[in-house]
Regions:
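Bacterial Sec-dependent N-terminal signal peptides
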Residues: 1-24
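Function-determining sites in protein domains
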Residues: 42
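Sequence/structural signature of beta-propeller domains
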Residues: 47-59, 63, 68
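Acidic/His-rich structured neighborhood in mature extracellular/periplasmic domains
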Residues: 63-199, 217, 222-224, 236
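Short alpha-helix capping/helix-loop boundary micro-motifs
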Residues: 200-212
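Short, surface-exposed secondary-structure edge patches
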Residues: 211-215, 231
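C-terminal structured interaction module
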Residues: 229-236
Length: 236
């Protein structure tokens, strides 16, 4: 049986808005503005309220993997009509941050998305935070999220990360073909998180108990970790 982990990320706010070139369609930009218009009617203006609200707006959106792999040269892709688990979380978080910053504009959404998805906001394939443990660490440094691994219980087990899936499965990543420098940078990313020890809630402890209800809150991001070789987190 696979081992699972729940990592709770409470959300903090930062502001750093600048203009940029992005890859998007008109329906995507219109949807962003439509969602902002709806969110303005909320009485609860907290970050957690925005996270729950925007999260619910994407019910029924098709699950499509690898929507970020469409360009030979990396671009900031905005796609609200096809989502996987990671792009879903990034989309909801970027929308929520823009509202919490009182900047409900398409430009603000894109700026937030850029800093959530890429290390230091630099749009480049090797800077994309491919491993979610790395995503957590970098977004924690940026003050965008807070990584919570307590109290004990329910965080009663420990996982030691060993990441090498991308560099040992290059055939699954066409963008890396023939790009030795990029491969080295991905290997550096893997090395930086390998050995990380993180507390998690074991499957048997995921129950409708008082301690779990007091630990997991509305708007939290939950990461599920697997024992699959080379990977650390399988779903969010």
């Amino acid at each position: 049986m696979k081992k699972t982990v729940i990592c709770i990320l409470s959300l903090l706010l930062t502001a750093n808005i600048s203009a940029q070139v992005i890859d998007y369609t008109k329906p995507d930009s219109l949807k962003v503005m439509s969602l902002f218009k709806k969110a303005k009617t909320l009485k609860d203006k907290s970050m957690s309220s925005y996270m729950v609200f925007f999260g619910r707006q994407f019910k029924g959106v098709p699950y499509v993997a690898k929507t970020l792999e469409k360009n030979a040269n990396e671009k900031l892709i905005v796609n609200l009509h096809q989502l996987d688990c990671t792009t879903y979380v990034e989309t909801v978080l970027a929308l929520s941050k823009a509202m919490a910053q009182h900047k409900p504009t398409f430009a603000s959404y894109c700026e937030n998305l850029k800093h959530i998805r890429y290390r230091n906001g630099k749009v480049a394939y090797p800077a994309r935070q491919h491993y979610f443990t790395y995503w957590i660490q970098e977004n924690t440094k940026e003050g965008i999220v807070k990584n919570i691994q307590s109290p004990t219980p329910p965080f009663s087990a420990t996982q030691t990360v060993k990441a090498n899936y991308m560099t040992t499965h290059l055939e699954s990543y066409p963008m890396l073909k023939g790009k030795q420098q990029w491969i080295k940078q991905i290997a550096d990313m893997e090395k930086s998180i390998t050995g990380t020890r993180q507390k998690y809630i074991p499957t048997k402890a995921v129950t409708n108990s008082n301690v779990v209800r007091k630990t997991v809150h509305n708007g939290d991001i939950i990461a599920i970790v697997t024992t699959k070789a080379g990977l650390e987190i399988s779903h969010i």
